[in-house]
Amino acid sequence: MKFRNLFFAAVAGSAVAAPLAKEQKKRDSVFQWIGANESGAEFGENNLPGVWGTDYIFPDVSAITTLIDKGMNIFRIQFKMERLVPDSMTGAYDEAYLQNLTTVVNAVTDAGVHAILDPHNYGRFNGEIMSTPSDFQTFWKNLAGQFQSNSLVIFDTNNEYHDMDQELVLNLNQAAIDGIREAGATEQYIFVEGNSYTGAWTWTDVNDNMKNLEDPQDKIVYQMHQYLDSDGSGTSETCVSGTIGQERVTSATQWLKDNKKVGIIGEFAGGNNDQCKTAVKGMLDYLAENTDVWKGALWWAAGPWWGDYMYSLEPPNGVAFTGMLDVLQAYLG
């Protein structure tokens, strides 16, 4: 969970055709992946489909380049399914929206780093819980087909399922996996997410059945999110304590080990203050001590419309870019 606010800034450039498999950029970091979410194309979710440049925006490629130069090697690119396929989950694409999304993805992978496609829909489509796994499988077969030749693309099944039947969450994730592989996208990682906003601190209580997911390519990564404020929602600059980061990922770490799985913290953040800096460092240090199961983490969030949002990692003036990057720097490549 996280708070979202809208501000205006520049957009990414025009699209080009999806590239062939890219060479991965070489780097030196304790983690396989460390990076940021790139927010904007999911904004204005109460005004769908909305107007590009008014209700939503695409990430600024030059800002992403700055973060790559700082050592980041993975970017989770948010979008709304209703804008990509406005008629139905199995329907035709809005070609302009797809083109803009593809432009950002290509810019990231052309730099030799990973781009995550994140349908930021919370397990819903047009406000209704997605209850038909076969339609979701078709959605993912179609979308993965657009990027199946690009090995640096990662498919994130859906952002933060919540308040849903647990078996349905499992089945939707499995349907996504099946659709992606059916499309011929066999080299790419798939990030799966759980119920209860995919929280690491509630994972073992809520999402134990997710261990039953199957992928013929064995490239599933369990994506969890973790914020450090009192309710774990990511809506406050305050962190509970300097140790709360490590505390909230400990049980999930053991679950990954017990079930021989690997995971990533797909969203995390803390306020620009000493206690949160200590808590963030403590969590990342703990993840770094357990890289057999934790493959990295992504900050929430960069994006051109964040303005003075408390967690903004957008160069050059984002609150976290100027105030938290020194903490993150130790883990960057």
UniProtKB/Swiss-Prot annotation:
Listed name of the protein: Probable endo-beta-1,4-glucanase B
Active site residues per record: 160 (proton donor), 267 (nucleophile)
Sites where a glycan is attached: 37, 100
Cellular component GO terms held in the UniProt record: extracellular region
Similarity-based family: Belongs to the glycosyl hydrolase 5 (cellulase A) family.
Catalytic activity: Endohydrolysis of (1->4)-beta-D-glucosidic linkages in cellulose, lichenin and cereal beta-D-glucans
GO biological process, one term: cellulose catabolic process
Natural source organism: Aspergillus oryzae (strain ATCC 42149 / RIB 40) (Yellow koji mold)
Signal sequence extent: 1-17
One MF annotation (Gene Ontology) recorded for this entry: cellulase activity
Keyword Iron: no
